[in-house]
Amino acid sequence: MSYTDLKQKIDTGEVVLLDGGIGTEILRHGYTWASHQLKNEPKLNLEIHKDYISAGAHVITTNTFQLSRRSFRNHFASDEHMALQGVANLTDRVGELVNDSVQLADNARKALGRDDVLI
C-alpha cells in the first residue's frame, strides 16, 4: 500500500489498522520500555512488529518513543551520569538508534513478505 492508498482509505472511511503500543508489548514480555531494547533485544522488537503485521496491521510504527537528545538530557543529569549508567555518549547515538528502529520494522515487513505494510 502506498501513502496515497492510505489517504484514500481514510478519506473513504475504510478501516485502517495501526499497530498498538510497542512499549506495552515490551513490558508484557518482561522488559522495561525505557531502555527500548533496540540494542539489547533487537529480536524482541522484530517479533513485536511481526506480531502486529500478522494480526492485520496496515501501518506499523517504529520504537522511537523518547529517542531524542532533549529527552536524554531531561532524563540524565549530565554526561557523567550517562557514563555511570553505562550509556556514555548516548546523545550522540540518537540517529543510530532511530535508524536501528526503522530497520527492525522494515526487517519485520520483509520477513513476512509484506512490503505493503507502511512504516
Question: Predicted segment positions?
Answer:
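Domain-level signal for soluble alpha/beta catalytic cores
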Residues: 1-119
